[in-house]
């Protein structure tokens, strides 16, 4: 007998933008989604700012989006937690951060502050770095080196020079700190096991084995003139730098885990085999948040706050079979983040990881692995064993981040083809498909200045129900999706899940 599965399809980076200028979603030929949107109950829901536990006006992101969707409630994010701790002063008494400072005092060693130098608020925030500099000054630490990971994805592609200049001014005001290395996030924040990139950052930090610069801002200016934007700055070293040495402290101030794991493991994991480490300094390493539950030899400054009864746990306790499926670049989002930031695999939960294509940037293959994901999922649906399926298509986000408009259009069209196949298959089984997104991106590819626009947008995202006649309310948010799914599946909503179903009674 055929199962009647409920499929939650998350089209990463698919926002609603009424302005068609620079809008790859509006420009794409998407007959399936156009038909689905026209013929089925639909609403638009909040995926940014206060709706997802971020500061008002702050763009959402994939980690935040999937956490809120899986939790079925507004989850207050690490950006807010850390910023509040700075404001109330508790940041400066944080035990892990104090330990890092005390280690430097005890060993007369250097403090290295490493992270994404940006106000994007997706992986880090530069105000958190400034607070660490102030703390170092208060502790009387003299040797403080900043390793500047440049953004160009969550903010403008050439905003990095301004962030460097602001940092230099802050260090002058506070009275401590020198820029040691500068590197694009393409190298330092890989999450796809492309360790040749990470190695360049590691060698720059530990051996100063990289091109040298006298003035960071001037180096950035030259990079722009050479056509190299922030994200792709090849790791380089200041004339004032000292390498990371035995006894030094490192505080990695990114609060989002996924792109901080590889470089952290290179420093702390004795079994790390991503590349041969010429030097392995024994350091006192602080992660701003928990990057991995089993990360060895680190302290965590802001430990995770547990999310009780996320959607996956509800399914498991109801005795249902569930499947999580995505390509590699979004696999953590439908598993770790969807499960409330925990590595737990629930009873009855299966996971399928499809490799992402091995290309330098995803505009070179805008379909990514969407067709492989879809082919695999079609076969799994036809096995008739799953009650609930959580799926992510990465294309609109990952290709959107490249800033290449024509490629983003192709990405949308690939997702359209795949969603059309899956909706028809689920319908043939008598099942229900819910279509949504975690945040916007491909809905704005060109900025007001006419240059490529690579960050996420703050636009609302679609929520569509196919195969379950109903009326949907307005004013919802991502945290309302799980309660809606539970209502459709006739499952009780746990009291911990404070979101409200989008279905009008």
Indicate where each model-derived feature is located.
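Feature captures the catalytic ectodomains and active-site-proximal regions of enzymes
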Residues: 1-505
């Amino acid at each position: 007998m055929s199962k009647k599965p409920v499929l939650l399809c998350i089209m990463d980076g698919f926002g609603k933008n009424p302005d068609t200028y620079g809008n790859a979603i509006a420009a794409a030929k998407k007959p399936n989604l156009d038909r689905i949107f026209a013929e089925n109950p639909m609403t638009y829901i909040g995926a940014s700012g206060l709706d997802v536990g971020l500061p008002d006006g702050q763009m959402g992101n994939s980690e935040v989006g999937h956490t809120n969707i899986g939790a079925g409630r507004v989850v207050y994010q690490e950006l807010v937690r850390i910023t509040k701790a700075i404001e109330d002063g508790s940041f400066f008494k944080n035990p892990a951060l104090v330990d890092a400072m005390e280690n430097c005092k005890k060993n007369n060693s250097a403090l290295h502050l490493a992270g994404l130098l940006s106000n994007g608020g997706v992986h880090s925030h530069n105000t958190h770095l400034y607070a660490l500099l102030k703390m170092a000054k208060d502790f009387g630490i003299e040797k403080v080196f900043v390793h500047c990971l440049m953004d160009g994805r969550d903010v403008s592609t050439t905003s990095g020079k301004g962030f460097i200049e602001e940092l230099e001014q802050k260090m002058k005001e506070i009275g401590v700190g020198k820029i040691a290395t500068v590197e694009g996030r393409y190298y330092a924040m890989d999450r796809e096991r492309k360790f040749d990139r990470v190695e360049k950052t590691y060698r720059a930090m530990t051996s100063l084995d990289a091109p040298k610069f006298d003035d960071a801002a001037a180096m950035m200016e030259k990079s722009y003139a050479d056509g190299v934007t922030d994200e792709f700055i090849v790791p380089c070293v200041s004339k004032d730098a000292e390498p990371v040495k035995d006894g030094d402290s490192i505080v990695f101030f990114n609060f989002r885990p996924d792109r901080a794991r590889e470089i952290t493991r290179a420093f702390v994991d004795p079994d790390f085999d991503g590349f041969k480490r010429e030097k392995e300094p024994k350091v006192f390493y602080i992660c701003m948040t928990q990057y991995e539950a089993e990360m060895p030899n680190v302290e965590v400054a802001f430990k995770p706050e547990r999310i009780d009864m996320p959607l996956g746990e509800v399914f498991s306790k109801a005795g249902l079979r569930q499947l999580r499926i995505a390509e590699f670049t979004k696999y953590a989002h439908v598993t770790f983040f969807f499960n409330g930031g925990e590595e737990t695999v629930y009873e009855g939960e299966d996971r399928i990881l499809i490799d992402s294509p091995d290309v330098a940037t995803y505009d070179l293959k805008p379909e990514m692995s969407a067709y492989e994901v879809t082919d695999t999922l079609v076969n799994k649906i036809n096995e008739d064993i799953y009650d609930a399926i959580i799926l992510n298509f990465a294309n609109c986000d990952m290709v959107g981040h490249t800033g290449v408009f024509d490629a983003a259009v192709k990405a949308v069209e690939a997702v359209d083809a795949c969603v059309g196949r899956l909706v028809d298959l689920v319908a043939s089984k008598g099942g229900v498909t819910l279509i949504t997104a975690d945040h916007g991106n491909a809905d704005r590819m060109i900025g007001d200045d006419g240059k490529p626009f690579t960050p996420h947008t703050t636009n609302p995202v679609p929520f569509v129900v196919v195969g379950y006649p109903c009326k949907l309310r307005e004013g919802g948010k991502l945290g309302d999706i799980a309660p809606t799914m539970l209502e459709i599946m006739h499952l009780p909503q746990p009291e911990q899940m404070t979101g409200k179903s989008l279905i009008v009674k």
